[in-house]
């Protein structure tokens, strides 16, 4: 892909190798292929994807949701506050025949009212969140008990974010 467009690739599963191009106007920075491949190699050793329920927060382009769907996850919810992001995810999911539920909402408001539980909650908040704002994500997830038993909360963050003092993180 060329500079000034947002290009992603599905790493594995039924749509392995599929390249997706998102509108350049989206306010996102998709997870890199290298980081996504490393993450999914770890998850692949611990989970049966077809049995997972997924909650993708700050979903952006839907990059992570598509990867889970391609690998067989059937219950995926993608949440983002940006209308154009949600519209792109919905359109792409329909084109690829992925069962992804999209929700246009501020993630914090969604979490406060959430009734869903998930096996994996993936969050990719903006890197410019301050620490207090960033730490609200795990705080709400654990206070509201939004993870199923043996579930995992995965938060992508900048190298400057320190989670070592926060309980439940390894």
What are these regions (language model features)?
Residues 1-170:
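Class I S-adenosyl-L-methionine-dependent methyltransferase catalytic core
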